[in-house]
Amino acid sequence: MKNVTDSFVSLGHWPYAGSFGFNTDILATNPINLSVVLGVLIFFGKGVLSDLLDNRKQRILSTIRNSEELRGAAIEQLEKARTRLRKVEIEADEFRVNGYSEIEREKSNLINAASENLERLENYKNETIRFEQQKAINQVRQRVFQQALQGALGTLNSCLNKELHLRAISSNISILGAMKEIMD
């Protein structure tokens, strides 16, 4: 057992400055650690993220449907206003001599009110969609960050044990001893 431990300590030995060596300490190589963490994140986070995005998509679609219904109601109001406008125009032809300018004002007011109402509803729909999209993006970001953090902590906790700490400490002590001998 001591020979096995010594071989691992010698494999994890860091070369001195100015020399070339191959680092076989798996825990000290970042690309392997990063690929393991990313693999775990992708494997475990894929389903949760897709469910979250599907739920978000359904909420956004329902908001769009509600906005479309509001738009339909506004178009219906606009049609009613146009019908009323046609009625007013017929009455305007009959009473042109008595109140042409007032009828024109009423016509403009009706058109402006209907247009403003439609524009206001369209703006509300667009603001609602943007708000829901931003909210979905923020929730996804937060969820991914939490999952990444939990995965990294889980990986670290599963990799760290007492024997590994003792080997790292003894390796570092031998490196410091060798450096002290070189400096003396």
Swiss-Prot record:
Coiled-coil regions listed in the entry: none
Lipid bilayer topology: Single-pass membrane protein
Localisation per UniProt entry: Plastid, Chloroplast thylakoid membrane
Alphabetized GO MF terms: proton-transporting ATP synthase activity, rotational mechanism
InterPro entries cross-referenced by the UniProt entry: ATP_synth_b/b'su_bac/chlpt (IPR002146)
Keyword terms of this UniProt record: ATP synthesis, CF(0), Chloroplast, Hydrogen ion transport, Ion transport, Membrane, Plastid, Thylakoid, Transmembrane, Transmembrane helix, Transport
Regions that span the bilayer: 27-49
GO CC annotation: chloroplast thylakoid membrane; proton-transporting ATP synthase complex
Subunit organization: F-type ATPases have 2 components, F(1) - the catalytic core - and F(0) - the membrane proton channel. F(1) has five subunits: alpha(3), beta(3), gamma(1), delta(1), epsilon(1). F(0) has four main subunits: a(1), b(1), b'(1) and c(10-14). The alpha and beta chains form an alternating ring which encloses part of the gamma chain. F(1) is attached to F(0) by a central stalk formed by the gamma and epsilon chains, while a peripheral stalk is formed by the delta, b and b' chains.
Other notes: In plastids the F-type ATPase is also known as CF(1)CF(0).
Reported function: F(1)F(0) ATP synthase produces ATP from ADP in the presence of a proton or sodium gradient. F-type ATPases consist of two structural domains, F(1) containing the extramembraneous catalytic core and F(0) containing the membrane proton channel, linked together by a central stalk and a peripheral stalk. During catalysis, ATP synthesis in the catalytic domain of F(1) is coupled via a rotary mechanism of the central stalk subunits to proton translocation.
UniProt family annotation: Belongs to the ATPase B chain family.
Name of this protein: ATP synthase subunit b, chloroplastic
Organism in which the protein naturally occurs: Piper cenocladum (Ant piper)
Lineage: Eukaryota, Viridiplantae, Streptophyta, Embryophyta, Tracheophyta
